């Protein structure tokens, strides 16, 4: 069932691309790619058009809507405190591969080819512009993924292959990190599959994350970029760690007590608390019936 649903969604998302070029064609991904952002009447740039609040300011505590997380992930998210990002050893952490395509208000990317300087063989792609400098390499030369015991990094280990005019990338060896910036965790046992499809000057990337530790079903999300050749992706921001936590004892880790419940998001928007907690059932259209029943029950209180 999980495989059937995934294939159907990918086919729906990229079905129009099939008519752009023959099945054997390989689209050109090289260039500067900009995250689309809304432009205000005065010309100022506002937040991006896709999931703006989640990707810029970040989701509110307790907002797990649309995430097929299990109870273990939910408990870890409830215990998470944003102050953990103020620890000196964490202030320079980049966004992990599981999230970096969406993070930092939406990254602006440079995609370039990696060419062997001696043989001129095309080895892969380099993608730069991610928050914190966790730039990625996608190997296209057929090399295998390393042992499960090999080092896990922020960018993971990625290999790609062409499926018609769509690039499919498989990433493993990712650090334990997060899939959303309010504590929703991702484990080092996850696998990420990405599908890159170009529609003229638009590049759509569908991400599918399988995580046996924290997800009940694969998490699927898409992001869109616009080809912007006049853009120039700069160097990563340098971090200078400082004490932001005050007089805390050495080794203290910001956290909420196990069993805590983040209810502010549900209260603020008048959403039944149960509907904010994620889970695979909340990602399907049929959940609208459950939501209606929860709202009716909420109205009687």
Role assignments for model-derived ranges:
Residues 8-19:
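Bacterial N-terminal signal peptides
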